[in-house]
Regions:
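Feature for soluble, non-membrane regions of globular proteins
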Residues: 1-191
């Protein structure tokens, strides 16, 4: 059965970019609920012994929305927490920076595309930096959808569900995304 991962930082460590209250609710309540629901859905089923990625792929193919949504949200949040750190942002490791320049034509173009993906995601969802074959791509997805089901490998994800930012930013999703990008991303992990 799946468990809530321990964060690599305290709930107050990302403040003021992401407040302690937001992190308490987001990690301790929302993420925990996805895990609890997932465990209840898969208990005693053929899914119970599968890896999280296999559950996502199988439930997506079989149109098992309850299992898929909760499994995918658990996976998405696991990545989201790892992609952030206190005093993040800053310098990108040269290997990743070179790949970004190669695939996007420059780091600022990538930044703009990533933030735009999150801003233009209608309703709840995610924006992603993923590997598609050997190329970095920015995508967005509605609700719990994950690039894994499209044969991509996500390496950076930003949650744009309102529970991610509303307490701190109200309806200012662009400001949340800019701060996430410039001040929270753990580029060493993304690399």
């Amino acid at each position: 059965m799946f468990e809530l991962p321990k964060l690599d930082y305290s709930n107050s460590a990302l403040s003021p970019i992401m407040s302690e209250q937001t992190l308490d609710l987001h990690h301790g309540k929302h993420h925990q609920t996805y895990i609890t629901n997932l465990n209840n859905f898969i208990k005693g089923s053929e899914y119970e012994k599968l890896s999280l990625e296999d559950i996502i792929k199988k439930s997506s193919n079989e149109k098992k929305a309850g299992i898929f949504n909760n499994a995918s949200q658990h996976w998405n949040h696991n990545l989201f927490w790892k992609c952030m750190k206190p005093n993040g942002g800053g310098n990108v490791p040269s290997k990743l920076e070179n790949k970004i320049k190669e695939d996007f034509g420059g780091f600022e173009k990538f930044r703009e595309e990533f933030i735009n993906a999150g801003v233009t995601q209608f309703g709840s969802g995610w924006c992603w930096l993923s590997l598609k074959e050997d190329k970095l791509v920015v995508t967005k997805s509605p609700n719990a959808e994950n690039p894994i089901i499209h044969n991509m490998k996500p390496i950076l994800g930003c949650d744009v569900w309102e529970h991610s930012y509303y307490l701190d930013y109200r309806n200012k999703r662009p400001a949340y995304l800019e701060n996430f990008f410039d001040k929270l991303i753990n580029w060493e992990y993304v690399n």
